[in-house]
Amino acid sequence: MAKKVVGFIKLQIPAGAANPAPPVGPALGQKGVNIMEFCKQFNAKTQSQSGTIIPVVITVYSDKSFTFITKTPPAAVLLVKEAGLQKGSGEPNKNKVGKVTEEQVRKIAELKMPDLNAFDIDGAMQMIRGTARSMGIVVEG
């Protein structure tokens, strides 16, 4: 018989840097998950992407076991990295803080494609352009 799902936990954790401190510890502790076991598995799986924020969905079962799925980094994080910025604009409609090319947008869209709700690469690129616009980043080309 299949295990009964007790809940889902969605977190955004820096790759290779999960530790029992907040926000990871309290979120997993509420569901009774072995926090250190999750941290070890997550850090091992995301070691190669260190420094990037990785969204993770943890499925908790009734016997306190868990599985987790890592997603692609948020589009905003990828855009900031491509544009070479620290963060997006506080006033995106007035202050433009950086520029990305159409090729960079395509690269991000191809990376994000599995997690985006888009049928083709053009639809995914349109979503990435919208994210860039809302961050005060100009798309050239």
Curated annotation (Swiss-Prot):
SUPFAM superfamilies: Ribosomal L11/L12e N-terminal domain, Ribosomal protein L11, C-terminal domain. One or more lysine residues are methylated. One of its GO terms (cellular component) is cytosolic large ribosomal subunit. Pfam families: Ribosomal_L11 (PF00298), Ribosomal_L11_N (PF03946). GO terms for molecular function: large ribosomal subunit rRNA binding; structural constituent of ribosome. One of its GO terms (biological process) is translation. Keywords: Methylation, Ribonucleoprotein, Ribosomal protein, RNA-binding, rRNA-binding. InterPro entries: Ribosomal_uL11, Ribosomal_uL11_bac-typ, Ribosomal_uL11_C, Ribosomal_uL11_C_sf, Ribosomal_uL11_N, Ribosomal_uL11_N_sf. Forms part of the ribosomal stalk which helps the ribosome interact with GTP-bound translation factors. Belongs to the universal ribosomal protein uL11 family. Part of the ribosomal stalk of the 50S ribosomal subunit. Interacts with L10 and the large rRNA to form the base of the stalk. L10 forms an elongated spine to which L12 dimers bind in a sequential fashion forming a multimeric L10(L12)X complex. This is Large ribosomal subunit protein uL11. It comes from Chlorobium phaeobacteroides (strain BS1).
